[in-house]
């Protein structure tokens, strides 16, 4: 007897459809799973056997072969349990499922038959939707997440016995059991019967032809001795909430307002520019000047994710097993990731035999914050160079090459020197570092990486006697309004191009939309010679100037915009030793 169900697995962060083929044949009772399964999948044979028997069904006393197709793709995880169990029950004639060809099945089985949620449901269901599937059967714990994909009917299962339906006839074993408080535990009288059935299922006593399910003989399949239950899923239909939080709701970071930050008006200006064009930014200053505090407020001035971006980000978090509160809908706030400086390179960009998403992919469409950047291992920082340039992470393994999205804004902070007090301006906090030690400290961040950071901003220590430093200045709402207006201009300008922000301009599009004009070009070329700027720095200054012009509502870049952009290249200047 042959049957086929449909499931899915993760391959990187993408869902891949997997056919679960079940074959029952005469022979020694055993279950064999083939198709490059990992250990968790091979162990499914024991989980499914126990779950099927403990819920009143009969496990076939035949040679059970389960093939996961395509067979040349390595499969991982426990998401195939439900499809394997339903495949065995339908192939053995205990259930009939007319909609099996258009229903995706995902879920891990416990030994008592209950369903446990699995990770990566969202990309799996998206793959099924693209393949033409109409419904998904999965654990109730994943139902809210599954409902985020439109066009798919979601059926939520708490327990394998729920597949019988409220009016389906029970099997002979189920008739001899007493369900107490919703459990599948047998009574004392039924215990011996269940034990005998278990022995039969293991091939210890009964013969093959006495089984209550169809078996193939020389004259063809026989009729089942027990009632066949038609599997109707309507009683399992999941109804999603009528509405989810609006995309226009303020981000979590808006609870902490920039109006709380006294002074530092030029830093707020730099952060506004960075957010408007999604430019990389590095804040440099002594301890206690508010670098970390201001960057942590940065998500509050960024517009919420669009519907397309929200689905993209939510799928990445689902694949990484980090999707929380799926009942609230798609992730609408831009991600803000802040890994510790002890993180490894694999943790930052992703790793594993089948790589999982790293921090740069989890920060996709949002912000990756590296606090105290020089404390990160240099080799770890260097892995950022490719994703900062290409906006993707490419990881090569023996079996395949994986490409993950990594379109994020890099925000960093650092002290100006090893002791941290260079330029503090306080007589009791004088820098004790020599010029060579300052240079050695700053060299922990390589020149090519600094080249990819558009804004390098000094954050001085506020002076108590400076009235301007004690004023609150712009609030988060005001900065957010300016950023939204600038990004709206960019969206209109690049509506026919595969880019969203000024920071993504390159080549001919950069020359077209960020033309500095004759006067601006002369200014830039003179600075290229005096400061030794690279052509990459030249291009990034143009991108920054374009964003400054957008914030001013200007159609063309002026020399004033270029001059302001040049002020944010502080690390291009040599450090000065305090006397």
Predicted ranges, named:
Residues 339-360:
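Short glycine-rich substrate-engagement loop in P-loop NTPases that contacts/grips substrate
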């Amino acid at each position: 007897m042959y049957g086929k169900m449909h499931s899915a697995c993760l391959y990187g962060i993408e869902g891949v459809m997997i056919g679960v083929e079940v074959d029952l044949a005469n022979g020694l009772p055993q279950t064999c799973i083939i198709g490059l399964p990992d250990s968790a999948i091979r162990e499914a044979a024991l989980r499914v056997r126990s779950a099927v028997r403990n819920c009143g069904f009969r496990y076939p006393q035949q040679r059970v072969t389960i093939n996961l197709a395509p067979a040349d793709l390595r499969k991982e995880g426990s998401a195939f349990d439900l499809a394997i169990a339903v495949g065995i029950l339908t192939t053995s004639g205990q259930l009939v499922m007319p909609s099996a060809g258009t229903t995706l099945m995902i879920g891990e089985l416990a030994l008592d038959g209950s369903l446990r949620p699995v990770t990566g449901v969202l990309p799996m269901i998206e793959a099924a939707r693209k393949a033409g599937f109409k419904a998904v059967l999965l654990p109730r714990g994943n139902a809210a997440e599954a409902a985020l994909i439109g066009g798919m009917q979601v059926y939520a299962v708490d327990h394998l016995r729920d597949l019988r339906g409220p009016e389906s006839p029970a099997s002979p074993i189920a008739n001899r059991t007493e369900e107490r408080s919703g459990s599948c535990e047998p009574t004392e009288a039924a215990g011996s019967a269940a034990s005998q059935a278990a022995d039969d299922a293991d091939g210890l006593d009964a013969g093959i032809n006495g089984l209550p399910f169809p078996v193939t003989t020389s004259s063809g399949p026989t009729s089942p001795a027990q009632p066949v239950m038609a599997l109707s899923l309507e009683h399992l239909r999941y109804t999603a909430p009528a509405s989810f939080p609006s995309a226009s709701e303020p981000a979590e970071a808006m609870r902490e307002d920039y109006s709380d930050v006294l002074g530092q008006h030029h830093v707020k200006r730099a952060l506004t520019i960075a957010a408007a064009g999604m430019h990389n930014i590095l804040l440099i200053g002594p301890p206690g000047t508010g670098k970390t505090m201001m960057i942590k407020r940065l998500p509050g001035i960024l517009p919420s994710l669009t519907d397309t971006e929200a689905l993209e980000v939510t799928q990445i978090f689902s694949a990484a097993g980090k999707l929380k509160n799926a009942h609230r809908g798609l992730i609408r706030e831009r991600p803000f990731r802040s890994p510790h400086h002890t993180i490894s390179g694999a943790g930052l960009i992703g790793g594993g035999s089948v790589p999982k998403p790293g921090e740069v992919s989890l920060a996709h469409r949002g912000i990756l914050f590296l606090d105290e950047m020089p404390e990160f291992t240099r080799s770890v920082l260097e892995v950022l160079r490719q994703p900062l340039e290409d906006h993707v992470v490419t990881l090569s393994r023996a079996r395949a090459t994986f490409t993950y999205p990594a379109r994020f804004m890099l925000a960093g902070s650092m002290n100006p020197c090893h002791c941290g007090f260079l330029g503090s301006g306080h007589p009791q906090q004088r820098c004790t570092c020599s010029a060579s030690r300052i240079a050695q400290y700053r060299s922990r961040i390589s020149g090519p990486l600094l080249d990819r950071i558009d804004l390098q901003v000094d954050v001085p220590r506020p002076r108590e006697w400076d009235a301007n430093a004690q004023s609150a200045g712009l609030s988060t709402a005001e900065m957010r309004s300016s950023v939204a207006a600038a990004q709206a201009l960019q969206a209109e300008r690049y509506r026919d191009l595969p880019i969203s922000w000024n920071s993504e301009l390159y080549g001919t599009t950069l020359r077209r939309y960020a033309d500095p004009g004759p006067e601006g070009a002369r200014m830039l070329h003179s600075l290229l010679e005096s400061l030794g700027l690279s052509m990459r720095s030249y291009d990034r200054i143009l991108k920054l100037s374009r964003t400054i012009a957008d914030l001013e509502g200007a159609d063309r870049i002026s020399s004033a915009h270029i001059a302001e952009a040049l002020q944010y290249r502080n690390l291009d200047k040599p450090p000065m030793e305090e006397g």
